């Protein structure tokens, strides 16, 4: 009994490249919350589908937003 060949998962498209967004604003918390897990961690590139440049921009924007107290460092207590 041989297994059927596994399909490759569909490649995710970078949201910022698709919509033509050039600047990721740290004040746009609604957008940045999509890239944070329920524990407050920044989601990986393979999970979000961002390109390398926009993933770096998102990470920087999230860190700036945390410094300005717009986003929490953690969401859940132990």
From Swiss-Prot:
Q: What is this protein called?
A: Small ribosomal subunit protein bS18
| Pfam families, per database record | Ribosomal_S18
HAMAP family recorded for this chain? Ribosomal_bS18 (MF_00270)
Q: Which InterPro entries match?
A: Ribosomal_bS18, Ribosomal_bS18_CS, Ribosomal_bS18_sf
Q: Which organism is it from?
A: Acidothermus cellulolyticus (strain ATCC 43068 / DSM 8971 / 11B)
Q: Which family does it belong to?
A: Belongs to the bacterial ribosomal protein bS18 family.
Gene3D superfamilies assigned = Ribosomal protein S18
Recall the GO molecular function terms of this protein's record: small ribosomal subunit rRNA binding; structural constituent of ribosome
Query: What lineage does UniProt assign to this protein's organism?
Result: Bacteria, Bacillati, Actinomycetota, Actinomycetes, Acidothermales
List UniProt keywords, sorted A-Z: Ribonucleoprotein, Ribosomal protein, RNA-binding, rRNA-binding
Which PROSITE patterns does the entry link to?
RIBOSOMAL_S18
Q: What does this protein do?
A: Binds as a heterodimer with protein bS6 to the central domain of the 16S rRNA, where it helps stabilize the platform of the 30S subunit.
Q: Which GO terms describe its cellular component?
A: cytosolic small ribosomal subunit
Superkingdom of the source species: Bacteria
């Amino acid at each position: 009994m041989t297994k059927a060949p596994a399909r490759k998962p569909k490649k995710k498209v970078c949201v910022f490249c698709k919509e033509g967004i050039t600047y990721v604003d740290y004040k746009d918390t609604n957008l940045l919350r999509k890239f944070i897990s329920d524990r407050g961690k920044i989601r990986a590139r393979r999970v979000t589908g961002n390109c390398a440049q926009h993933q770096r921009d998102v990470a920087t924007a999230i860190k700036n937003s945390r410094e300005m107290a717009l986003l929490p460092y953690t969401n859940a207590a132990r």
